[in-house]
Amino acid sequence: AAQKRPSQRSKYLASASTMDHARHGFLPRHRDTGILDSLGRFFGSDRGAPKRGSGKDGHHAARTTHYGSLPQKAQGHRPQDENPVVHFFKNIVTPRTPPPSQGKGRGLSLSRFSWGAEGQKPGFGYGGRASDYKSAHKGLKGHDAQGTLSKIFKLGGRDSRSGSPMARR
Protein backbone atom coordinates (compact mmCIF):
# COMPACT_ATOMS: atom_id res chain seq x y z
CA ALA A 1 0.00 0.00 0.00
CA ALA A 2 2.83 2.36 0.86
CA GLN A 3 4.35 1.79 -2.53
CA LYS A 4 1.06 2.25 -4.29
CA ARG A 5 0.33 5.58 -2.74
CA PRO A 6 3.37 7.52 -3.96
CA SER A 7 3.12 5.97 -7.39
CA GLN A 8 -0.52 6.88 -7.52
CA ARG A 9 0.25 10.38 -6.40
CA SER A 10 3.01 10.85 -8.93
CA LYS A 11 0.71 9.41 -11.53
CA TYR A 12 -1.90 11.97 -10.64
CA LEU A 13 0.61 14.76 -10.73
CA ALA A 14 2.00 13.48 -13.97
CA SER A 15 -1.41 13.22 -15.52
CA ALA A 16 -2.22 16.73 -14.40
CA SER A 17 0.94 18.16 -15.85
CA THR A 18 0.64 15.94 -18.89
CA MET A 19 -2.73 17.40 -19.62
CA ASP A 20 -1.26 20.81 -19.11
CA HIS A 21 1.62 19.89 -21.31
CA ALA A 22 -0.69 18.71 -24.02
CA ARG A 23 -2.54 21.96 -23.77
CA HIS A 24 0.66 23.91 -23.67
CA GLY A 25 2.29 21.98 -26.42
CA PHE A 26 -0.19 21.64 -29.24
CA LEU A 27 -0.63 25.02 -30.81
CA PRO A 28 0.22 28.27 -29.18
CA ARG A 29 -3.39 29.22 -29.60
CA HIS A 30 -4.55 26.01 -28.04
CA ARG A 31 -2.08 26.43 -25.25
CA ASP A 32 -3.32 29.87 -24.36
CA THR A 33 -6.92 28.86 -24.59
CA GLY A 34 -6.30 25.90 -22.35
CA ILE A 35 -4.62 28.05 -19.77
CA LEU A 36 -7.27 30.68 -20.09
CA ASP A 37 -10.06 28.21 -19.75
CA SER A 38 -8.64 26.55 -16.71
CA LEU A 39 -7.82 29.90 -15.19
CA GLY A 40 -11.18 31.31 -16.11
CA ARG A 41 -13.00 28.46 -14.46
CA PHE A 42 -10.55 28.84 -11.65
CA PHE A 43 -11.29 32.46 -11.11
CA GLY A 44 -14.97 32.13 -11.72
CA SER A 45 -15.22 29.65 -8.92
CA ASP A 46 -12.76 31.66 -6.89
CA ARG A 47 -14.86 34.76 -7.15
CA GLY A 48 -17.93 32.88 -6.10
CA ALA A 49 -16.22 31.19 -3.19
CA PRO A 50 -14.16 33.44 -0.95
CA LYS A 51 -12.22 30.40 0.21
CA ARG A 52 -10.08 30.87 -2.89
CA GLY A 53 -11.22 27.75 -4.70
CA SER A 54 -9.30 25.44 -2.42
CA GLY A 55 -10.57 22.34 -4.19
CA LYS A 56 -9.09 23.26 -7.52
CA ASP A 57 -6.28 24.91 -5.68
CA GLY A 58 -4.91 21.55 -4.67
CA HIS A 59 -5.05 20.37 -8.24
CA HIS A 60 -3.30 23.34 -9.75
CA ALA A 61 -1.32 24.29 -6.68
CA ALA A 62 -0.96 27.51 -8.55
CA ARG A 63 -3.43 29.74 -6.79
CA THR A 64 -1.77 30.80 -3.58
CA THR A 65 1.74 30.17 -4.77
CA HIS A 66 0.97 31.21 -8.28
CA TYR A 67 4.03 33.43 -8.40
CA GLY A 68 6.37 30.49 -8.07
CA SER A 69 4.01 28.08 -9.65
CA LEU A 70 3.47 29.78 -12.94
CA PRO A 71 7.13 29.95 -13.91
CA GLN A 72 7.65 26.51 -12.44
CA LYS A 73 4.89 25.04 -14.52
CA ALA A 74 6.32 26.74 -17.51
CA GLN A 75 9.79 25.48 -16.78
CA GLY A 76 8.51 21.97 -16.49
CA HIS A 77 6.66 22.07 -19.75
CA ARG A 78 8.21 24.56 -22.14
CA PRO A 79 11.43 25.84 -20.72
CA GLN A 80 12.46 27.94 -23.69
CA ASP A 81 9.13 29.21 -24.87
CA GLU A 82 6.91 29.64 -21.88
CA ASN A 83 9.39 30.92 -19.38
CA PRO A 84 10.38 34.12 -21.13
CA VAL A 85 6.80 34.49 -22.18
CA VAL A 86 5.54 34.20 -18.65
CA HIS A 87 8.29 36.48 -17.48
CA PHE A 88 7.45 38.95 -20.18
CA PHE A 89 3.80 38.90 -19.33
CA LYS A 90 4.50 39.30 -15.68
CA ASN A 91 6.59 42.37 -16.32
CA ILE A 92 4.80 43.95 -19.24
CA VAL A 93 1.21 42.90 -19.25
CA THR A 94 0.40 42.87 -15.59
CA PRO A 95 0.40 46.62 -15.04
CA ARG A 96 -1.84 47.29 -17.97
CA THR A 97 -3.91 44.17 -17.60
CA PRO A 98 -7.24 45.77 -16.76
CA PRO A 99 -7.66 47.85 -19.94
CA PRO A 100 -7.15 44.98 -22.39
CA SER A 101 -9.06 42.57 -20.24
CA GLN A 102 -11.96 44.97 -20.05
CA GLY A 103 -12.52 44.29 -23.70
CA LYS A 104 -13.10 40.64 -22.96
CA GLY A 105 -16.42 40.05 -21.32
CA ARG A 106 -15.15 37.69 -18.68
CA GLY A 107 -12.02 39.68 -18.04
CA LEU A 108 -14.03 42.81 -17.53
CA SER A 109 -16.28 41.50 -14.83
CA LEU A 110 -13.41 39.52 -13.42
CA SER A 111 -10.84 42.24 -13.10
CA ARG A 112 -13.35 44.83 -12.07
CA PHE A 113 -14.83 42.54 -9.53
CA SER A 114 -11.60 41.47 -7.97
CA TRP A 115 -10.00 44.90 -7.98
CA GLY A 116 -13.17 46.49 -6.74
CA ALA A 117 -13.70 43.78 -4.17
CA GLU A 118 -10.55 44.84 -2.42
CA GLY A 119 -12.06 48.21 -1.72
CA GLN A 120 -10.30 50.14 -4.44
CA LYS A 121 -11.84 52.02 -7.34
CA PRO A 122 -13.56 49.26 -9.35
CA GLY A 123 -13.86 51.27 -12.52
CA PHE A 124 -10.43 52.80 -12.51
CA GLY A 125 -9.13 50.22 -14.90
CA TYR A 126 -5.47 51.07 -15.15
CA GLY A 127 -4.20 50.50 -11.66
CA GLY A 128 -7.24 50.10 -9.51
CA ARG A 129 -5.17 50.18 -6.37
CA ALA A 130 -4.92 53.50 -4.62
CA SER A 131 -1.14 53.68 -4.60
CA ASP A 132 -0.98 52.77 -8.27
CA TYR A 133 -3.43 55.52 -8.89
CA LYS A 134 -1.09 57.99 -7.23
CA SER A 135 2.08 56.73 -8.79
CA ALA A 136 0.44 56.56 -12.19
CA HIS A 137 -0.41 60.21 -11.85
CA LYS A 138 3.08 61.00 -10.74
CA GLY A 139 4.15 59.61 -14.07
CA LEU A 140 6.46 56.96 -12.63
CA LYS A 141 5.62 54.48 -15.32
CA GLY A 142 8.43 52.04 -14.76
CA HIS A 143 8.10 52.24 -11.02
CA ASP A 144 4.38 51.95 -11.29
CA ALA A 145 4.74 48.82 -13.32
CA GLN A 146 6.97 47.22 -10.74
CA GLY A 147 4.80 48.44 -7.90
CA THR A 148 1.72 47.06 -9.53
CA LEU A 149 3.50 43.82 -10.15
CA SER A 150 4.65 43.21 -6.63
CA LYS A 151 1.43 44.56 -5.24
CA ILE A 152 -0.60 42.22 -7.35
CA PHE A 153 1.52 39.31 -6.33
CA LYS A 154 1.32 40.22 -2.70
CA LEU A 155 -2.23 41.45 -2.31
CA GLY A 156 -4.29 40.06 -5.12
CA GLY A 157 -2.55 37.02 -6.50
CA ARG A 158 -5.73 36.37 -8.36
CA ASP A 159 -5.56 39.68 -10.16
CA SER A 160 -2.21 39.16 -11.71
CA ARG A 161 -3.06 35.58 -12.44
CA SER A 162 -6.31 36.50 -14.07
CA GLY A 163 -4.67 39.42 -15.77
CA SER A 164 -1.67 37.87 -17.35
CA PRO A 165 -3.48 35.06 -19.13
CA MET A 166 -6.41 37.31 -19.89
CA ALA A 167 -4.14 39.68 -21.69
CA ARG A 168 -2.56 36.75 -23.45
CA ARG A 169 -5.75 35.91 -25.27
Curated annotation (Swiss-Prot):
| Region annotation (Disordered) ranges | 1-114, 133-169
Give the GO cellular component terms, alphabetically: cell periphery; compact myelin; internode region of axon; myelin sheath; neuronal cell body; plasma membrane; protein-containing complex
Q: Which residues carry this modification: Citrulline?
A: R23, R29, R41, R47, R63, R96, R106, R112, R129, R158, R161, R168, R169
Q: Name one GO biological process term.
A: myelination
Disulfide connectivity for this sequence is: none
Q: Which residues carry this modification: Phosphoserine?
A: S7, S10, S17, S38, S54, S114, S160, S164
- PTM Omega-N-methylarginine: at which residues? R41, R47, R106
- Tissue specificity annotation: Found in both the central and the peripheral nervous system.
Membrane-protein topology: Peripheral membrane protein
Deamidated glutamine-modified residues are Q102, Q120, Q146
InterPro entries with a match to the protein in the record: Myelin_BP
Q: Cite a single GO MF annotation.
A: lipid binding
Q: Where are the transmembrane segments?
A: none
The protein's UniProt keywords, in alphabetical order, are: Acetylation, Autoimmune encephalomyelitis, Cell membrane, Citrullination, Membrane, Methylation, Phosphoprotein
Induces experimental autoimmune encephalomyelitis (EAE) 1: annotated segments: 43-87
Where in this protein does the record put region Induces experimental autoimmune encephalomyelitis (EAE) 2? 114-122
Q: Which purpose does this protein serve, as stated in its record?
A: Is, with PLP, the most abundant protein component of the myelin membrane in the CNS. Has a role in both the formation and stabilization of this compact multilayer arrangement of bilayers. Each splice variant and charge isomer may have a specialized function in the assembly of an optimized, biochemically functional myelin membrane.
Question: What is said about its interaction partners and assembly?
Answer: Homodimer; self-associates in the presence of lysolipid.
Protein name per UniProt: Myelin basic protein
Q: Which gene encodes it?
A: MBP
